[in-house]
Amino acid sequence: MNLITFNIDDKLLNKRSYSIVSKKKNLLFHFGCQHNKSFEKINKYRVAKVYELNKKGNLPNKLKYLEKSYNELLKNLYKKLNKAHNKNYDQNYWEILIGKWLKTFVHQTYSNWEILKKIENKYNIKSFSKISLSDNFFIPENTWHAHQLIRSSQHKYNLFHHWLISKMLENKKKIKINHLSLKNNLSIESELLKLSKPNKYQNIFYKSLDNKIFYYLWDVPRKIKIEIMKYFKFLNIRLNTKTIREYHPKYFDRDLIFYNEYQPNNFQSFLKNIIKFTFPKIFLENFNTLERMYKKLNWPRKPKYILTSYPYYEELFKLYCAQNYFSGSKIIITQHGMCNIFQYDDALGPASINKTFFHAQLSWGKNRKKGLKKFLFTKKYTTKVNKFKFKKNKKILLILYSLSEMEDRLPNGYSDNNSINKIIYNSTIKYLKQVEKSLLKKNDIKILQNNRYPMLKNSIKKKYRNIKFMGLEKSFDKVIFQYNLSVHFFIGTPFFESIYLNQPTILIFDSKIYSSFDKKFLRFIKKFIDNKICFTNAAEAAEFINNNYTNLEHWWKSPKRQKILNEFCEMFCGKSKNLHEDFKSITKI
């Protein structure tokens, strides 16, 4: 059997290479084809099936090994970077700069390593179709570019994963390599560069008597920012965004800097062996530009606290954090609070960065699992309790997720993304079939699509052509009050927003979509099921809505149900009773 790890439907090969591939008995990697335009069609290709949700037994050990590999490579890299740049910074300093890139790179590489291992054990792989590509094509400009190469399946010419797996198979003597060529008019290198974007930073107007608080890329409502400026008596206002345009790249011998004696079939050795082809230029050849720009910044020097949320892609701000951390500043992260609903860490999620250099990470509520500190829900802010009023002219909004074709999780202990998308599709169809005709026309669908092909939308439209669809053009919190009810087929941010805003909410819960949950969260799922807020069967949810739609107000406002919802909010999407007290808690952390 011949293994293919590029998208065969993209037809990137020249005629000769394509004829070679088409004659073979092929097995495709999970992202190796279009997966059809509809779930109703049978895939004409044989796609490897290696994801097993029930095999969770060794998942904790795999995740520990993943963390160990990350720390081992970080330790190796920070010494090399100090030597290359003639510095003497500690490991935490460099982790602030390269940590998010490195964590994603290690995790995604390990996922592919484990997927490939399972394919080799399950299928009789005799050969591998390899496209001839230069290793240097995949050296990223910065963290954003690296993440687009590693995680994006949107771009037709993104062959990073194919290249990565081909490097894993280079020393497998039992597998024959069939060399293929691209069409003559394709310039993959220039296409991959299009995935990058310029390094930018914000011009800030800042005034303070004591430099106590500085926030940047802080994802909280404007009301909270205004109140915290009043409370701590400072001004922190973004004026505009600037682009770094002038670079003076410095030459480094990557072969020499990243030299590693390769050990076959050793994952950590493999990582060290390919790092020279994957390490972002901004931390090596263009690091002098970052240092030069840092000296020109008008941001406050040595603030006591730096508040931020998603600093991953602004390299200059990360350097600012590293320099000020080195000088004693405390870095506080307010991030996506969903991290603490799962039993195991999401290795690519907001809590994924090693916490040694962060003074604190603030949660969305009281659940302090994984070291998170209590804070409030930062996606929305309100001091008023929403008193829902049912209105006949309002409708029902279905919230669907469509996950990427690019797998980013380990094969044991999780479902693959395509299977999850199909579960969401089947649940949606089951729900729509059961909804009464008079109510069916009141249903709109909002899809948060993260994949290349709109298969979920296409599949639903084939059966229900008149349903109105919306995408990411408007965020959920901007449309929620236009509807009487939201029905969620996936536990995502909109689910928490809806409950926080006290809008009628129903969750269609299928355990096959998720890995293991935190015990506290599971207890609330059980309470939600008992109180008809959550259903494990989409048809039963539809039947409940058929019988209770005009009575939603009474159902949602019942004291027992409201008590459970308030307890859930307190734990997972906390409301502020006193903003000033919440701010005080920051300075006491």
Question: How would you label these PLM feature ranges?
Answer:
Residues M1-I589:
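Catalytic-core helical/loop segments in enzymes performing group transfer/polymerization on anionic/lipid-linked
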